[in-house]
Protein backbone atom coordinates (compact mmCIF):
# COMPACT_ATOMS: atom_id res chain seq x y z
CA UNK A 1 0.00 0.00 0.00
CA UNK A 2 1.37 3.38 -0.94
CA UNK A 3 1.46 5.84 1.92
CA UNK A 4 -0.54 8.89 0.85
CA UNK A 5 1.13 12.12 1.83
CA UNK A 6 -0.57 15.40 2.50
CA UNK A 7 0.97 18.61 1.23
CA UNK A 8 -0.75 21.96 1.60
CA UNK A 9 -0.15 25.09 -0.42
CA UNK A 10 -0.76 28.13 1.73
CA UNK A 11 -1.79 31.27 -0.12
CA UNK A 12 -2.61 34.80 0.82
CA UNK A 13 -6.30 35.27 1.40
CA UNK A 14 -6.44 37.47 -1.68
CA UNK A 15 -3.79 36.22 -4.14
CA UNK A 16 -2.12 38.88 -6.22
CA UNK A 17 -3.59 39.28 -9.70
CA UNK A 18 -1.45 40.83 -12.40
CA UNK A 19 -2.30 42.25 -15.78
CA UNK A 20 0.69 41.15 -17.84
CA UNK A 21 3.90 39.20 -17.32
CA UNK A 22 6.46 37.39 -19.47
CA UNK A 23 6.75 33.73 -18.46
CA UNK A 24 8.26 30.63 -20.07
CA UNK A 25 4.95 30.15 -21.84
CA UNK A 26 5.09 33.64 -23.34
CA UNK A 27 3.39 36.92 -22.56
CA UNK A 28 0.50 36.27 -20.17
CA UNK A 29 -2.21 38.93 -19.92
CA UNK A 30 -3.97 37.84 -16.72
CA UNK A 31 -2.56 35.71 -13.93
CA UNK A 32 -2.53 35.03 -10.19
CA UNK A 33 0.59 34.85 -8.04
CA UNK A 34 0.59 32.21 -5.30
CA UNK A 35 3.20 31.26 -2.69
CA UNK A 36 3.27 27.52 -2.00
CA UNK A 37 4.30 26.25 1.40
CA UNK A 38 4.89 22.54 1.61
CA UNK A 39 3.74 20.70 4.76
CA UNK A 40 4.24 16.92 4.68
CA UNK A 41 2.33 14.65 7.05
CA UNK A 42 4.57 11.62 7.51
CA UNK A 43 4.53 8.99 10.26
CA UNK A 44 6.85 9.82 13.13
CA UNK A 45 10.39 8.75 12.35
CA UNK A 46 9.65 8.10 8.68
CA UNK A 47 12.25 9.07 6.11
CA UNK A 48 10.86 11.48 3.55
CA UNK A 49 11.76 10.55 -0.02
CA UNK A 50 12.93 13.28 -2.34
CA UNK A 51 9.72 12.99 -4.38
CA UNK A 52 6.69 11.44 -2.71
CA UNK A 53 4.57 8.77 -4.38
CA UNK A 54 1.34 10.69 -3.76
CA UNK A 55 0.61 14.28 -2.79
CA UNK A 56 -2.37 16.51 -2.17
CA UNK A 57 -2.34 20.26 -2.77
CA UNK A 58 -4.88 22.73 -1.49
CA UNK A 59 -4.96 26.04 -3.33
CA UNK A 60 -7.27 28.79 -4.44
CA UNK A 61 -8.07 29.44 -8.08
CA UNK A 62 -10.11 32.55 -8.85
CA UNK A 63 -10.62 32.91 -5.12
CA UNK A 64 -12.19 29.46 -4.78
CA UNK A 65 -10.49 26.62 -2.86
CA UNK A 66 -9.61 23.51 -4.84
CA UNK A 67 -7.87 20.28 -3.89
CA UNK A 68 -5.36 18.82 -6.35
CA UNK A 69 -4.47 15.14 -5.97
CA UNK A 70 -1.19 14.00 -7.54
CA UNK A 71 0.34 10.55 -7.99
CA UNK A 72 3.83 9.90 -9.33
CA UNK A 73 3.71 8.59 -12.90
CA UNK A 74 5.54 5.32 -12.35
CA UNK A 75 5.03 4.13 -15.90
CA UNK A 76 6.80 7.15 -17.42
CA UNK A 77 10.26 5.60 -17.83
CA UNK A 78 11.26 2.05 -18.68
CA UNK A 79 13.86 0.33 -16.54
CA UNK A 80 16.32 0.30 -19.46
CA UNK A 81 15.77 3.99 -20.23
CA UNK A 82 18.79 5.49 -21.99
CA UNK A 83 19.95 8.88 -23.24
CA UNK A 84 22.24 9.46 -26.21
CA UNK A 85 24.02 12.60 -27.34
CA UNK A 86 27.14 13.25 -29.38
CA UNK A 87 30.51 14.82 -28.64
CA UNK A 88 31.74 17.66 -30.89
CA UNK A 89 33.81 15.15 -32.88
CA UNK A 90 30.76 12.93 -33.45
CA UNK A 91 31.33 10.22 -30.84
CA UNK A 92 28.12 8.62 -29.61
CA UNK A 93 27.69 8.97 -25.83
CA UNK A 94 24.98 6.81 -24.25
CA UNK A 95 24.12 6.83 -20.55
CA UNK A 96 21.55 5.01 -18.41
CA UNK A 97 20.44 7.56 -15.81
CA UNK A 98 18.66 6.49 -12.64
CA UNK A 99 15.00 7.38 -13.07
CA UNK A 100 13.35 5.65 -10.11
CA UNK A 101 12.93 8.79 -7.99
CA UNK A 102 11.69 11.22 -10.61
CA UNK A 103 9.40 14.21 -10.14
CA UNK A 104 6.62 13.85 -12.74
CA UNK A 105 3.01 13.43 -11.65
CA UNK A 106 -0.51 12.93 -12.92
CA UNK A 107 -3.56 14.03 -11.01
CA UNK A 108 -7.09 15.32 -10.75
CA UNK A 109 -9.18 17.94 -8.98
CA UNK A 110 -11.44 16.86 -6.14
CA UNK A 111 -15.15 16.77 -7.05
CA UNK A 112 -14.45 17.39 -10.76
CA UNK A 113 -14.88 14.16 -12.72
CA UNK A 114 -13.58 15.66 -15.97
CA UNK A 115 -10.46 17.18 -14.45
CA UNK A 116 -6.93 16.17 -15.37
CA UNK A 117 -3.46 17.28 -14.33
CA UNK A 118 0.11 16.78 -15.49
CA UNK A 119 2.66 18.36 -13.17
CA UNK A 120 6.43 18.48 -12.76
CA UNK A 121 7.49 18.97 -9.14
CA UNK A 122 11.23 19.08 -9.82
CA UNK A 123 11.77 22.77 -9.07
CA UNK A 124 8.48 24.10 -7.85
CA UNK A 125 5.25 23.16 -9.61
CA UNK A 126 5.06 23.35 -13.37
CA UNK A 127 2.43 21.98 -15.70
CA UNK A 128 -1.28 22.16 -16.31
CA UNK A 129 -4.59 21.13 -14.79
CA UNK A 130 -8.12 21.23 -16.14
CA UNK A 131 -10.70 22.70 -13.77
CA UNK A 132 -14.40 23.05 -14.57
CA UNK A 133 -13.70 22.66 -18.26
CA UNK A 134 -10.97 25.30 -18.42
CA UNK A 135 -7.24 24.70 -18.81
CA UNK A 136 -4.92 26.35 -16.30
CA UNK A 137 -1.14 26.46 -16.32
CA UNK A 138 1.14 26.83 -13.32
CA UNK A 139 4.85 27.59 -13.22
CA UNK A 140 7.33 28.99 -10.70
CA UNK A 141 8.44 32.58 -11.10
CA UNK A 142 12.16 33.13 -11.50
CA UNK A 143 12.62 35.39 -8.51
CA UNK A 144 15.54 35.11 -6.11
CA UNK A 145 14.69 33.75 -2.66
CA UNK A 146 11.02 33.40 -3.56
CA UNK A 147 8.60 30.52 -3.93
CA UNK A 148 6.16 32.56 -5.99
CA UNK A 149 4.23 30.76 -8.73
CA UNK A 150 1.98 32.06 -11.48
CA UNK A 151 -1.39 30.43 -12.23
CA UNK A 152 -3.19 31.46 -15.41
CA UNK A 153 -5.60 30.25 -18.05
CA UNK A 154 -4.25 29.03 -21.36
CA UNK A 155 -6.54 31.48 -23.15
CA UNK A 156 -4.64 34.37 -21.51
CA UNK A 157 -1.34 33.49 -23.18
CA UNK A 158 -0.71 35.77 -26.16
CA UNK A 159 -0.37 33.81 -29.40
CA UNK A 160 2.33 34.95 -31.81
CA UNK A 161 0.47 33.69 -34.87
CA UNK A 162 -3.28 33.24 -34.89
CA UNK A 163 -3.28 31.46 -38.27
CA UNK A 164 -4.58 27.87 -38.01
CA UNK A 165 -1.83 25.30 -37.53
CA UNK A 166 -2.45 22.12 -39.48
CA UNK A 167 -1.39 18.50 -39.32
CA UNK A 168 0.17 17.40 -42.60
CA UNK A 169 -1.77 14.14 -42.85
CA UNK A 170 -4.28 14.42 -45.68
CA UNK A 171 -6.06 11.09 -45.33
CA UNK A 172 -9.56 11.42 -43.96
CA UNK A 173 -12.50 9.20 -43.12
CA UNK A 174 -13.39 8.82 -46.80
CA UNK A 175 -10.11 7.03 -47.41
CA UNK A 176 -10.83 4.56 -44.64
CA UNK A 177 -14.21 2.79 -44.48
CA UNK A 178 -17.89 3.80 -44.72
CA UNK A 179 -18.56 6.23 -41.90
CA UNK A 180 -20.19 4.69 -38.84
CA UNK A 181 -22.57 6.65 -36.68
CA UNK A 182 -21.11 7.90 -33.42
CA UNK A 183 -23.39 5.58 -31.46
CA UNK A 184 -21.77 2.61 -33.20
CA UNK A 185 -18.20 3.65 -32.46
CA UNK A 186 -17.56 1.57 -29.36
CA UNK A 187 -15.15 -1.16 -28.38
CA UNK A 188 -16.96 -4.21 -27.08
CA UNK A 189 -16.46 -5.67 -23.64
CA UNK A 190 -15.11 -8.78 -25.33
CA UNK A 191 -12.41 -6.69 -27.03
CA UNK A 192 -11.39 -5.17 -23.72
CA UNK A 193 -11.58 -8.53 -21.98
CA UNK A 194 -8.91 -10.09 -24.13
CA UNK A 195 -7.06 -6.89 -24.98
CA UNK A 196 -6.15 -4.88 -21.88
CA UNK A 197 -3.61 -2.08 -21.93
CA UNK A 198 -1.15 -1.82 -24.79
CA UNK A 199 2.37 -0.53 -24.20
CA UNK A 200 4.13 1.87 -26.57
CA UNK A 201 7.88 2.09 -25.95
CA UNK A 202 8.75 5.57 -27.17
CA UNK A 203 12.02 7.18 -28.21
CA UNK A 204 12.15 10.97 -28.59
CA UNK A 205 14.74 12.44 -30.95
CA UNK A 206 15.77 16.12 -30.80
CA UNK A 207 17.36 17.75 -33.84
CA UNK A 208 20.30 20.14 -33.95
CA UNK A 209 18.05 23.16 -34.53
CA UNK A 210 16.37 22.53 -31.17
CA UNK A 211 19.77 22.20 -29.50
CA UNK A 212 20.78 25.57 -30.95
CA UNK A 213 17.44 27.11 -29.98
CA UNK A 214 18.10 26.06 -26.37
CA UNK A 215 21.69 27.42 -26.37
CA UNK A 216 23.17 23.90 -26.26
CA UNK A 217 21.65 23.39 -22.79
CA UNK A 218 21.11 19.62 -22.83
CA UNK A 219 19.68 19.53 -19.30
CA UNK A 220 17.01 22.04 -20.31
CA UNK A 221 16.14 19.94 -23.35
CA UNK A 222 15.93 16.76 -21.27
CA UNK A 223 13.59 18.39 -18.76
CA UNK A 224 11.32 19.57 -21.56
CA UNK A 225 11.24 16.09 -23.12
CA UNK A 226 10.35 14.50 -19.76
CA UNK A 227 7.48 16.95 -19.34
CA UNK A 228 6.21 16.26 -22.87
CA UNK A 229 6.35 12.50 -22.32
CA UNK A 230 4.54 12.83 -19.00
CA UNK A 231 1.65 14.64 -20.67
CA UNK A 232 1.49 12.23 -23.63
CA UNK A 233 1.40 9.35 -21.14
CA UNK A 234 -1.49 11.04 -19.33
CA UNK A 235 -3.44 11.56 -22.55
CA UNK A 236 -3.16 7.95 -23.70
CA UNK A 237 -4.16 6.38 -20.38
CA UNK A 238 -7.77 7.04 -21.33
CA UNK A 239 -7.23 5.04 -24.54
CA UNK A 240 -5.99 2.04 -22.48
CA UNK A 241 -2.46 2.63 -23.77
CA UNK A 242 0.65 3.18 -21.66
CA UNK A 243 3.32 5.30 -23.36
CA UNK A 244 6.70 4.70 -21.70
CA UNK A 245 9.78 6.73 -22.53
CA UNK A 246 12.54 4.20 -23.24
CA UNK A 247 15.06 6.53 -24.85
CA UNK A 248 16.03 10.10 -25.66
CA UNK A 249 18.44 10.95 -28.45
CA UNK A 250 19.80 14.48 -28.87
CA UNK A 251 21.62 15.35 -32.10
CA UNK A 252 23.94 17.67 -30.23
CA UNK A 253 26.74 17.89 -32.81
CA UNK A 254 24.87 17.60 -36.12
CA UNK A 255 21.68 16.22 -37.61
CA UNK A 256 21.82 12.55 -38.58
CA UNK A 257 19.50 13.25 -41.51
CA UNK A 258 18.83 16.34 -43.59
CA UNK A 259 15.99 18.15 -41.80
CA UNK A 260 14.07 20.25 -44.32
CA UNK A 261 10.93 22.40 -44.07
CA UNK A 262 9.26 19.98 -46.50
CA UNK A 263 7.61 17.70 -43.95
CA UNK A 264 7.17 14.69 -46.23
CA UNK A 265 10.85 14.67 -47.11
CA UNK A 266 11.93 14.93 -43.48
CA UNK A 267 9.51 12.25 -42.29
CA UNK A 268 10.73 9.83 -44.95
CA UNK A 269 14.37 10.50 -44.05
CA UNK A 270 13.67 10.11 -40.34
CA UNK A 271 11.86 6.82 -40.92
CA UNK A 272 14.76 5.42 -42.93
CA UNK A 273 17.23 6.52 -40.23
CA UNK A 274 15.13 4.89 -37.54
CA UNK A 275 14.99 1.63 -39.51
CA UNK A 276 18.69 1.39 -40.36
CA UNK A 277 20.30 3.09 -37.37
CA UNK A 278 18.21 3.66 -34.26
CA UNK A 279 16.49 0.25 -34.25
CA UNK A 280 19.83 -1.53 -34.48
CA UNK A 281 20.94 -0.13 -31.12
CA UNK A 282 17.77 0.65 -29.15
CA UNK A 283 14.70 -1.58 -28.82
CA UNK A 284 11.55 0.52 -29.08
CA UNK A 285 8.14 0.66 -30.76
CA UNK A 286 7.80 4.24 -31.94
CA UNK A 287 10.03 7.28 -32.51
CA UNK A 288 9.08 10.94 -32.76
CA UNK A 289 11.41 13.67 -34.08
CA UNK A 290 11.12 17.15 -32.57
CA UNK A 291 12.51 19.94 -34.70
CA UNK A 292 12.89 23.70 -34.37
CA UNK A 293 12.78 24.04 -38.16
CA UNK A 294 9.61 25.78 -39.41
CA UNK A 295 7.80 23.10 -41.38
CA UNK A 296 6.00 24.29 -44.50
CA UNK A 297 2.35 24.98 -43.65
CA UNK A 298 2.14 22.17 -41.06
CA UNK A 299 3.17 21.53 -37.45
CA UNK A 300 3.37 17.75 -37.64
CA UNK A 301 3.23 14.73 -39.89
CA UNK A 302 3.10 10.97 -39.36
CA UNK A 303 2.36 7.75 -41.18
CA UNK A 304 -1.15 6.37 -40.62
CA UNK A 305 -1.69 2.86 -39.27
CA UNK A 306 2.03 2.17 -39.05
CA UNK A 307 2.74 1.32 -35.40
CA UNK A 308 5.51 -1.33 -35.15
CA UNK A 309 6.67 -0.84 -38.77
CA UNK A 310 10.48 -0.46 -38.86
CA UNK A 311 10.35 2.71 -40.96
CA UNK A 312 6.86 4.11 -40.66
CA UNK A 313 6.29 3.89 -36.89
CA UNK A 314 7.44 7.50 -36.78
CA UNK A 315 6.28 11.09 -36.71
CA UNK A 316 7.76 14.57 -36.80
CA UNK A 317 6.66 17.49 -34.62
CA UNK A 318 7.56 21.14 -34.91
CA UNK A 319 8.52 22.77 -31.61
CA UNK A 320 5.76 25.22 -32.34
CA UNK A 321 5.08 26.62 -28.87
CA UNK A 322 6.98 27.24 -25.61
CA UNK A 323 3.99 25.72 -23.82
CA UNK A 324 4.70 22.04 -23.21
CA UNK A 325 1.01 21.14 -23.29
CA UNK A 326 0.63 22.42 -26.85
CA UNK A 327 3.58 20.43 -28.19
CA UNK A 328 2.54 17.32 -26.22
CA UNK A 329 -0.91 17.44 -27.81
CA UNK A 330 0.68 17.67 -31.27
CA UNK A 331 2.82 14.65 -30.39
CA UNK A 332 -0.21 12.71 -29.15
CA UNK A 333 -2.00 13.64 -32.40
CA UNK A 334 0.81 12.38 -34.64
CA UNK A 335 1.27 9.21 -32.60
CA UNK A 336 -2.47 8.75 -32.95
CA UNK A 337 -2.00 8.53 -36.71
CA UNK A 338 0.62 5.81 -36.15
CA UNK A 339 -2.06 3.96 -34.15
CA UNK A 340 -4.48 4.07 -37.07
CA UNK A 341 -6.47 7.12 -35.95
CA UNK A 342 -7.72 9.44 -38.68
CA UNK A 343 -8.76 13.07 -38.43
CA UNK A 344 -12.12 13.67 -36.81
CA UNK A 345 -15.20 14.43 -38.87
CA UNK A 346 -18.50 16.01 -37.93
CA UNK A 347 -19.70 12.68 -36.58
CA UNK A 348 -17.10 12.70 -33.83
CA UNK A 349 -17.39 14.06 -30.31
CA UNK A 350 -15.55 14.18 -27.00
CA UNK A 351 -18.19 15.91 -24.92
CA UNK A 352 -18.01 19.66 -24.63
CA UNK A 353 -14.32 19.81 -25.51
CA UNK A 354 -12.33 20.09 -28.71
CA UNK A 355 -10.80 16.76 -29.70
CA UNK A 356 -7.14 15.86 -30.21
CA UNK A 357 -7.57 14.57 -33.77
CA UNK A 358 -8.93 17.77 -35.30
CA UNK A 359 -6.99 18.50 -38.51
CA UNK A 360 -5.87 21.83 -37.03
CA UNK A 361 -4.83 22.62 -33.48
CA UNK A 362 -7.76 23.95 -31.47
CA UNK A 363 -7.76 27.40 -29.84
CA UNK A 364 -7.36 25.59 -26.52
CA UNK A 365 -5.34 22.36 -26.77
CA UNK A 366 -7.44 19.34 -25.91
CA UNK A 367 -6.31 16.30 -23.96
CA UNK A 368 -9.30 14.20 -25.06
CA UNK A 369 -9.73 11.76 -27.93
CA UNK A 370 -13.13 11.52 -29.60
CA UNK A 371 -15.36 8.45 -29.76
CA UNK A 372 -14.25 8.08 -33.39
CA UNK A 373 -10.59 8.08 -32.36
CA UNK A 374 -11.26 5.43 -29.72
CA UNK A 375 -12.92 3.18 -32.27
CA UNK A 376 -10.26 3.87 -34.92
CA UNK A 377 -7.43 3.03 -32.54
CA UNK A 378 -8.86 -0.21 -31.23
CA UNK A 379 -10.11 -1.26 -34.66
CA UNK A 380 -6.51 -0.94 -35.85
CA UNK A 381 -5.18 -2.84 -32.82
CA UNK A 382 -7.72 -5.65 -33.12
CA UNK A 383 -7.53 -6.11 -36.89
CA UNK A 384 -3.92 -5.21 -37.70
CA UNK A 385 -2.50 -6.68 -34.48
CA UNK A 386 0.64 -4.54 -34.09
CA UNK A 387 2.56 -7.06 -32.02
CA UNK A 388 5.27 -4.76 -30.67
CA UNK A 389 2.83 -2.98 -28.35
CA UNK A 390 1.38 -6.16 -26.85
CA UNK A 391 4.39 -7.02 -24.71
CA UNK A 392 3.65 -6.11 -21.10
CA UNK A 393 6.58 -5.08 -18.90
CA UNK A 394 7.77 -7.84 -16.60
CA UNK A 395 6.76 -7.33 -12.99
CA UNK A 396 10.41 -7.05 -12.01
CA UNK A 397 10.90 -4.28 -14.57
CA UNK A 398 8.25 -2.00 -13.10
CA UNK A 399 9.91 0.61 -10.91
CA UNK A 400 7.28 0.97 -8.19
CA UNK A 401 5.62 -0.92 -5.33
CA UNK A 402 2.85 -3.27 -6.56
CA UNK A 403 -0.58 -1.63 -6.76
CA UNK A 404 -3.62 -3.85 -7.32
CA UNK A 405 -5.94 -2.30 -9.88
CA UNK A 406 -3.45 -0.50 -12.16
CA UNK A 407 -3.68 -3.18 -14.89
CA UNK A 408 0.03 -3.96 -14.64
CA UNK A 409 1.09 -7.41 -13.46
CA UNK A 410 3.56 -6.77 -10.64
CA UNK A 411 5.46 -8.82 -8.07
CA UNK A 412 3.06 -10.70 -5.77
CA UNK A 413 0.08 -10.45 -8.16
CA UNK A 414 -1.38 -13.36 -10.12
CA UNK A 415 -3.40 -11.04 -12.33
CA UNK A 416 -4.43 -7.38 -12.50
CA UNK A 417 -7.48 -6.48 -14.56
CA UNK A 418 -8.02 -2.98 -13.19
CA UNK A 419 -10.61 -1.81 -10.72
CA UNK A 420 -13.61 -4.03 -9.85
CA UNK A 421 -15.82 -1.63 -11.79
CA UNK A 422 -13.74 -1.88 -14.98
CA UNK A 423 -12.42 -5.46 -14.84
CA UNK A 424 -13.45 -7.53 -17.88
CA UNK A 425 -11.31 -10.60 -17.14
CA UNK A 426 -13.40 -13.60 -16.06
CA UNK A 427 -10.31 -15.35 -14.65
CA UNK A 428 -9.21 -12.61 -12.24
CA UNK A 429 -10.55 -11.37 -8.89
CA UNK A 430 -10.12 -7.61 -9.27
CA UNK A 431 -10.35 -6.97 -5.53
CA UNK A 432 -7.36 -9.18 -4.64
CA UNK A 433 -5.45 -9.46 -7.95
CA UNK A 434 -5.56 -13.23 -7.45
CA UNK A 435 -6.90 -15.83 -9.87
CA UNK A 436 -10.43 -17.05 -9.28
CA UNK A 437 -10.94 -20.58 -8.02
CA UNK A 438 -10.33 -23.11 -10.79
CA UNK A 439 -8.36 -20.70 -12.97
CA UNK A 440 -4.79 -21.48 -13.94
CA UNK A 441 -4.12 -18.14 -15.64
CA UNK A 442 -5.65 -14.81 -16.46
CA UNK A 443 -3.56 -13.59 -19.36
CA UNK A 444 -0.76 -14.56 -21.71
CA UNK A 445 -0.28 -16.05 -25.15
CA UNK A 446 -0.60 -19.55 -23.68
CA UNK A 447 -3.80 -18.91 -21.70
CA UNK A 448 -7.14 -20.03 -23.15
CA UNK A 449 -10.36 -19.72 -21.16
CA UNK A 450 -8.44 -19.45 -17.88
CA UNK A 451 -6.46 -22.65 -18.57
CA UNK A 452 -2.92 -23.24 -19.83
CA UNK A 453 -2.83 -23.96 -23.57
CA UNK A 454 -1.92 -27.51 -24.53
CA UNK A 455 1.76 -28.36 -24.78
CA UNK A 456 2.98 -27.83 -28.33
CA UNK A 457 0.53 -25.06 -29.22
CA UNK A 458 2.37 -22.50 -31.35
CA UNK A 459 2.44 -19.15 -29.61
CA UNK A 460 5.02 -17.24 -31.67
CA UNK A 461 5.50 -17.89 -35.38
CA UNK A 462 8.87 -18.34 -37.04
CA UNK A 463 10.04 -15.17 -38.76
CA UNK A 464 12.91 -16.79 -40.66
CA UNK A 465 15.04 -19.91 -40.87
CA UNK A 466 17.14 -18.43 -38.06
CA UNK A 467 14.13 -17.74 -35.82
CA UNK A 468 12.32 -20.96 -34.88
CA UNK A 469 8.72 -20.83 -33.70
CA UNK A 470 7.98 -21.02 -29.99
CA UNK A 471 5.39 -23.36 -28.48
CA UNK A 472 3.47 -23.45 -25.22
CA UNK A 473 4.79 -25.79 -22.55
CA UNK A 474 1.42 -26.67 -21.04
CA UNK A 475 2.75 -25.52 -17.66
CA UNK A 476 2.64 -21.73 -18.07
CA UNK A 477 0.47 -19.00 -19.54
CA UNK A 478 3.49 -17.27 -21.05
CA UNK A 479 5.01 -18.05 -24.41
CA UNK A 480 8.65 -19.10 -23.94
CA UNK A 481 11.27 -16.45 -24.61
CA UNK A 482 11.92 -15.62 -28.25
CA UNK A 483 15.16 -17.41 -29.09
CA UNK A 484 17.20 -17.37 -32.30
CA UNK A 485 19.64 -19.79 -33.78
CA UNK A 486 23.22 -18.98 -32.86
CA UNK A 487 24.76 -16.09 -34.80
CA UNK A 488 27.05 -17.50 -37.46
CA UNK A 489 25.05 -20.68 -38.07
CA UNK A 490 24.77 -21.38 -41.83
CA UNK A 491 21.35 -20.67 -43.37
CA UNK A 492 19.62 -20.68 -46.77
CA UNK A 493 21.72 -23.59 -48.04
CA UNK A 494 24.96 -21.90 -46.94
CA UNK A 495 24.23 -18.70 -48.86
CA UNK A 496 24.26 -16.85 -45.55
CA UNK A 497 24.82 -16.99 -41.81
CA UNK A 498 22.28 -16.34 -39.08
CA UNK A 499 22.41 -12.89 -37.49
CA UNK A 500 19.99 -11.84 -34.73
CA UNK A 501 17.22 -14.11 -36.01
CA UNK A 502 17.61 -13.20 -39.69
CA UNK A 503 19.58 -14.67 -42.58
CA UNK A 504 20.90 -11.56 -44.35
CA UNK A 505 22.04 -12.18 -47.92
CA UNK A 506 22.72 -9.65 -50.67
CA UNK A 507 20.02 -10.99 -53.00
CA UNK A 508 17.30 -10.19 -50.44
CA UNK A 509 18.78 -6.76 -49.82
CA UNK A 510 18.80 -6.01 -53.56
CA UNK A 511 15.18 -7.15 -53.77
CA UNK A 512 14.18 -4.89 -50.88
CA UNK A 513 15.83 -1.89 -52.57
CA UNK A 514 14.86 -2.41 -56.21
CA UNK A 515 12.27 -5.19 -56.52
CA UNK A 516 12.18 -8.36 -58.62
CA UNK A 517 14.76 -9.43 -61.21
CA UNK A 518 17.57 -7.70 -59.33
CA UNK A 519 20.47 -9.76 -58.01
CA UNK A 520 23.86 -9.42 -56.32
CA UNK A 521 26.32 -7.76 -58.72
CA UNK A 522 29.62 -9.17 -59.91
CA UNK A 523 32.64 -8.78 -57.64
CA UNK A 524 34.15 -6.10 -59.89
CA UNK A 525 31.33 -3.69 -59.02
CA UNK A 526 32.19 -3.83 -55.32
CA UNK A 527 35.74 -2.64 -56.03
CA UNK A 528 34.25 0.87 -56.23
CA UNK A 529 33.99 0.75 -52.45
CA UNK A 530 37.74 1.46 -52.33
CA UNK A 531 37.08 5.04 -53.54
CA UNK A 532 35.97 6.46 -50.21
CA UNK A 533 33.26 8.67 -51.74
CA UNK A 534 29.46 8.76 -51.57
CA UNK A 535 28.99 5.70 -53.80
CA UNK A 536 31.81 3.63 -52.40
CA UNK A 537 33.04 3.36 -48.82
CA UNK A 538 32.96 0.92 -45.89
CA UNK A 539 32.08 3.05 -42.87
CA UNK A 540 32.12 6.59 -41.51
CA UNK A 541 34.41 7.90 -38.80
CA UNK A 542 33.97 11.45 -37.48
CA UNK A 543 31.86 12.23 -40.53
CA UNK A 544 34.50 11.01 -43.01
CA UNK A 545 33.85 8.19 -45.47
CA UNK A 546 36.49 5.50 -44.98
CA UNK A 547 37.41 3.55 -48.14
CA UNK A 548 37.26 -0.23 -48.00
CA UNK A 549 40.39 -2.31 -47.87
CA UNK A 550 40.49 -4.77 -50.81
CA UNK A 551 39.40 -7.65 -48.58
CA UNK A 552 36.45 -5.63 -47.20
CA UNK A 553 34.85 -4.35 -50.43
CA UNK A 554 31.72 -6.51 -49.97
CA UNK A 555 31.02 -4.84 -46.62
CA UNK A 556 30.55 -1.33 -47.99
CA UNK A 557 27.88 -0.07 -50.38
CA UNK A 558 25.67 -2.76 -51.90
CA UNK A 559 25.84 -3.27 -55.67
CA UNK A 560 23.13 -5.12 -57.56
CA UNK A 561 22.62 -6.39 -61.11
CA UNK A 562 19.31 -5.20 -62.58
CA UNK A 563 17.80 -7.63 -65.10
CA UNK A 564 14.28 -6.21 -64.97
CA UNK A 565 12.51 -5.40 -68.29
CA UNK A 566 14.02 -2.37 -69.98
CA UNK A 567 16.99 -2.30 -67.62
CA UNK A 568 20.57 -3.39 -68.16
CA UNK A 569 22.55 -2.09 -65.22
CA UNK A 570 25.26 -4.48 -64.02
CA UNK A 571 26.39 -2.25 -61.12
CA UNK A 572 23.25 -0.66 -59.70
CA UNK A 573 23.52 1.02 -56.33
CA UNK A 574 21.25 3.09 -54.09
CA UNK A 575 22.25 6.43 -52.61
CA UNK A 576 20.19 9.09 -50.85
CA UNK A 577 21.35 12.39 -49.38
CA UNK A 578 18.70 12.07 -46.69
CA UNK A 579 19.99 8.70 -45.48
CA UNK A 580 23.49 7.75 -46.54
CA UNK A 581 23.32 4.50 -44.60
CA UNK A 582 20.52 3.11 -46.74
CA UNK A 583 22.00 0.94 -49.48
CA UNK A 584 24.96 -0.27 -47.42
CA UNK A 585 25.52 -4.01 -46.97
CA UNK A 586 23.81 -5.04 -43.73
CA UNK A 587 25.77 -6.31 -40.70
CA UNK A 588 26.05 -10.10 -40.56
CA UNK A 589 25.88 -10.49 -44.35
CA UNK A 590 28.11 -13.18 -45.86
CA UNK A 591 31.04 -11.51 -47.64
CA UNK A 592 33.12 -14.63 -48.37
CA UNK A 593 33.14 -18.28 -47.38
CA UNK A 594 33.34 -18.40 -43.61
CA UNK A 595 33.24 -14.60 -43.29
CA UNK A 596 30.61 -11.95 -42.46
CA UNK A 597 30.40 -8.15 -42.43
CA UNK A 598 31.02 -6.44 -39.10
CA UNK A 599 31.48 -2.66 -38.81
CA UNK A 600 32.65 -2.36 -42.41
CA UNK A 601 35.09 -5.26 -42.21
CA UNK A 602 34.87 -8.78 -43.65
CA UNK A 603 35.80 -10.95 -40.66
CA UNK A 604 35.87 -14.64 -39.78
CA UNK A 605 32.44 -15.83 -38.71
CA UNK A 606 34.04 -17.81 -35.89
CA UNK A 607 35.33 -14.64 -34.22
CA UNK A 608 32.62 -12.16 -35.28
CA UNK A 609 30.17 -12.92 -32.44
Curated annotation (Swiss-Prot):
Annotated tissue distribution: Expressed by the venom gland.
Active site: residue positions: 334
Disulfide bonds: 308-388, 348-372, 350-355, 404-433, 415-428, 417-423, 427-450, 441-447, 446-472, 459-479, 466-498, 491-503, 510-560, 525-571, 538-548, 555-597, 591-602
Cofactor note: Binds 1 zinc ion per subunit.
Pfam families associated with the record: ADAM_CR, Disintegrin, Pep_M12B_propep, Reprolysin
Cited InterPro entries: ADAM_Cys-rich, Disintegrin_CS, Disintegrin_dom, Disintegrin_dom_sf, MetalloPept_cat_dom_sf, Peptidase_M12B, Peptidase_M12B_N, Reprolysin_adamalysin
EC primary class: hydrolase
Keywords on record: Calcium, Disulfide bond, Glycoprotein, Hemorrhagic toxin, Hemostasis impairing toxin, Hydrolase, Metal-binding, Metalloprotease, Protease, Secreted, Signal, Toxin, Zinc, Zymogen
Name of the protein: Zinc metalloproteinase-disintegrin-like
